[in-house]
A protein has these predicted regions:
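N-terminal loops that bind phosphate or other acidic moieties
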Residues: 2-140, 144-388
Length: 388
């Protein structure tokens, strides 16, 4: 056993289908502690997708899971879960819009973004605010909608009426008929509430890269529907939000929900990994580390595009701390990771793509750590020697 004590920070994403972020980190930590008396700290992390709630609520006081009945994407009632933690001014709710308006809630045969609504998302927000939350963190991935958040805003108290002074219908088709709007009641309800929206796409509201053109076909729209929604949303922006930037990066996320959050609710659109790292105060720990270990189930070219390992590695490199990554497997473009300069070493547990057997995942990851540990310990010692 190596008797040198190292300060090691472990911050891996989940290995999807096999291990949560904490389980993966704990498997690595256990293997390390068998070989060296190092100080090893595990931080669950995520990039806005699976495991984000776990990462943000880990180690927090008064974590309270919530389950409420809200309006689903087709107007039906669905059960939506979210989490509250903290107290007082720090009382925070973590919500995922997909719980109320996610694509998985809509049968394939009924997917039609002209009809689907974000009304339930607004109901979730109201519930959290009524329970005293002063901070909201909202993930907006996996939506079934393209209504520019009109449904959410209606649930929060806004009114969107047609030429007959009647409330418009649900979904993107309702946008076509909006003649007037009144949003005065919304900000009163959300007074002193800070909202951060996890948004990991940079698409604008309209245009060739906008929400209708790029994402609506994935939600059941045909070409005619796409053109119809693009025209309606452009008209809406012209009439009611002309001074606001429809080209804002992220405005087109979740069928324009990013636009509604930014413009009407004054929310901040943030990248998932950046928010998580900030909220868990990882930078403070990384500053004095001898080594940072990160990873995810599959590392490939997409890893560098806002994924957890890249975010963690960039933070470590800010303080010239060595970084190694363990992946369940490698995918196309892994050489972009190895040549990026972010990672000092990258290891794959298996050459086979796809999820591990969950029962074998912890064992196999731990074994890979044991097999490679001498290599990266030598790297740390060499770096320390060079700095002395």
């Amino acid at each position: 056993m190596n008797q040198t004590t190292y300060n090691i920070i472990i911050a891996t994403d989940s290995f999807k289908g096999s291990m949560t972020s904490y389980e993966a980190g704990d498997a690595i930590a256990t293997a390390i502690k068998e070989q060296t008396p190092s100080r090893v700290t595990v931080y669950p992390v995520a990039d806005g997708g699976e495991g984000t709630t776990e990462a943000l609520s880990f180690g927090r006081a008064a974590v309270l899971p919530q389950c409420i009945t809200v309006t689903g994407p087709l107007g039906e009632k669905v059960q939506a879960k979210y989490t509250i933690f903290g107290t007082g001014e720090e009382k925070t709710a973590i919500l995922e819009m997909a719980q109320a308006a996610g694509l998985t809630l809509v049968p394939v045969s009924q997917r039609n973004p002209l009809k689907t609504t974000t009304y339930g998302v607004g109901e979730m927000i109201l519930d959290a605010v009524r329970k005293g939350c002063k901070k909201l963190i909202v993930g907006i991935g996996g939506s079934a909608t393209n209504d520019v958040g009109i449904g959410m805003l209606q649930a929060l108290g806004a009114s969107f009426t047609d030429i007959n002074d009647q409330e418009v219908s649900d979904g993107a088709e309702g946008i076509e008929n909006i003649a007037a709007m009144d949003t005065t009641g919304i900000l009163k309800k959300l007074k002193d509430v800070d909202i951060k929206v996890i948004c990991d796409v940079n698409n604008p509201l309209v245009g060739d890269e906008g929400c209708s053109t790029v994402f609506a076909p994935q939600k059941g729209a045909d070409l005619q529907m796409v053109q119809r929604m693009e025209q309606a949303i452009t008209r809406f922006a012209d009439l009611f939000a002309k001074e606001y930037d429809r080209w804002l990066a992220g405005a087109g996320a979740a069928g324009g929900l990013g636009y509604a959050f930014a413009y009407f609710l004054h929310a901040e659109l943030v990248h998932g990994i950046d928010l998580v790292l900030q909220e868990i105060h990882l930078e403070e720990a990384v500053r004095t580390a001898d080594l940072v270990i990160t990873g995810e189930g599959r590392m490939d070219a997409q890893t560098l595009m806002g994924k957890t390992p890249a975010g963690v590695a960039r933070l470590a490199k800010k303080y010239a701390v060595p970084v190694i990554a363990y992946a369940g497997c490698f995918g196309d473009g892994i050489e972009q990771c190895t040549e990026s300069g972010l990672f000092d070493r990258v290891y794959a547990v298996t050459e086979q793509e796809g999820a591990f057997d969950p029962q074998m995942a912890v064992r196999d990851l731990g074994q890979k750590v044991r097999e490679t540990m001498s290599e990266w310990i030598h790297m740390i010692d060499t770096k320390k020697g060079a700095n002395e």
